[in-house]
Amino acid sequence: MGKPIVAIVGRPNVGKSTLFNKLAGKRIAIVEDTPGVTRDRIYAQAEWLNHNFTIIDTGGIEPESEDIIVAQMRRQAEMAIEMADVIMFIVDGKEGLTPADNEVALMLRKSKKPIVLVVNKIDRIEEEDNMYEFYNLGIGEPTTISASQALGLGDMLDKIVENFPKGYQDEEEDEYIRIAFVGKPNVGKSSLINKILGEERNIVSNIPGTTRDAIDSFLERDEDKFILIDTAGLRRRSKVKDQIERYSTVRTYAAIDRADVCILLIDAEEGISEQDKKIIGYAHELNKALMVVVNKWDLIEKETNTMNRFKKELQSELSFMSYAPYIFISAKTGQRVGKVLDLAKECYTNYSKRISTGVLNDVISKAVMMKEPPIVAMNRLKIYYVTQVATKAPTFVFFVNDPRTLHFSYERYLENQLRQSFDFTGTGIKMEFRERKE
């Protein structure tokens, strides 16, 4: 089971995005007073009392509207509700109970999901009595907050985590390697997965996942066990852009969140899109293992350097993940399809790699001897020792005299030395510099 998912639901303009930003800890959504406003990201990670969970801002639900954009937003909100473990139903304590609130409540009750009723915009203690009319929704005891002033959020979050699925934190990590296939619609994700499954003999099962997870395929090959996560269910069913475009990646984000390895599938004829970069950039931010598969390579007219030229263009577009390997395939003809899982396994192995402290310090000592740190602010960085503190992605802590004397170019040099000494193909590595007195 992945992290719990909490959907923030309510009619327009009740303060959902303001609350979303408070819980996410940073401003990552544009907040305006116009119903249906476009927002940049609706999916973020949050934490409360050692409970890590995912929050989704569903946008405003207007049950009776015939507007095509609003109707599409309503359908996407319903999808988020299906995915959610807990629903936060936000209402406006200043405006009071409205017929639209009753319509939303009716829809939420049908979901049979745990619902926490939150009365927002209670900015002063004398406004607390405004919550009582919301008992008429039949959802239970309301919790009052002021999202803009961050009042009452602790009590609200206590109620949220109380409703998380029992035992989700107790499950041991299983031995499956989870691989998410992401990319634009019609790029060939399903075809590639079907080809991989068709070429392997030891398929355990091929079952429909929950509404949250699209379709998971379970595969055993030799000593390895894989879960192939297909996000092919993502289809933008409308040509309408702006407001609804942001919803097209919700399930992809959920798949990335569960994955160890993320495969970005690119159509060789169409190239990479801004949406591709946003999606794989999110996986990079979460420190997932990454690789790029260029599909439909059979359709490209080729010269001697076509592949290298194409790869260089992609690497330029995806410069933030220079560590990712590339493979050019045709899911239709089967060209190089058999190598996709091999490369994903290699990325996962490097993603999970642990280096002994002794070997690590030998490499860094030699690196410092070859090139001393530059003098910064009249002082020179001195590295006492380094140790690896985590895997998935490999994380290294350098104990130094003064982290402020670290120049960004020397940090890049140290990372390059680690990559030259150890194979970290397919995975980012994290480096932290902490002060330690000599």
Curated annotation (Swiss-Prot):
InterPro entries: AAA+_ATPase, G_ENGA, GTP-bd, GTPase_Der, KH_dom-like, KH_dom-like_a/b, P-loop_NTPase, Small_GTP-bd. Transmembrane segments: none annotated. The keyword Methyltransferase does not apply. Residues 4-168, 177-352 form the EngA-type G domain. One of its GO terms (biological process) is ribosome biogenesis. GO terms for molecular function: ATP hydrolysis activity; GTP binding; ribosome binding. Belongs to the TRAFAC class TrmE-Era-EngA-EngB-Septin-like GTPase superfamily. EngA (Der) GTPase family. GTPase that plays an essential role in the late steps of ribosome biogenesis. Associates with the 50S ribosomal subunit. This is GTPase Der. The gene is der.
